[in-house]
Amino acid sequence: MGDPQGQQLTTRRSGPTWSQFLRSQAEAILACDFFTVDLLNGTQAYVLAVIEHATRRVRVLGVTQYPTGAWTAQQARNLLMDLGEQAHRAKFLIRDRGSNFTALFDAVLADAGIRTVLCNIRTARMNAIAERWIGGCRRELLDRTLIWNQPHLRRILRQYQTHHNQHRVPILGFTDRAR
């Protein structure tokens, strides 16, 4: 297939679309992202959260003022420990191309059999489930609460995580089977 100027036009690549991939692999997909919170003590905290696509179960992995590559890799180790027996089900982790996610972060996950899938640049829709949870957390909690410091932020995020994972009505027909 070519155009009048003799250049080849590309056709759509073979294989599933992004949405088909997400639906067919939901049981095996985790998604993570960082978000920031401004604290009343004048500092900014970075929060790393992971969500399971199939169950929408959220894990707030950590809060820090300085998210280094080593800290982020440690949060990956903590995630694997937290997943425990369920870690074998996870096959993919969707993340953005942020500089906080180093090769060590990816290596920790790869050792557990989890392949890192990078989002395209400026394509928040590729990580829409994580972005939606972060947006909900902001609207329902962070925009309505004065947060003094990191210990206070950790406490309210832990409470919100519990509320989200245990007390919210399941969506998309999912049940509490894996919560």
Question: Each PLM stretch: what is its role?
Answer:
Residues 1-179:
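Charged DNA-binding/catalytic regions of mobile-element recombinases
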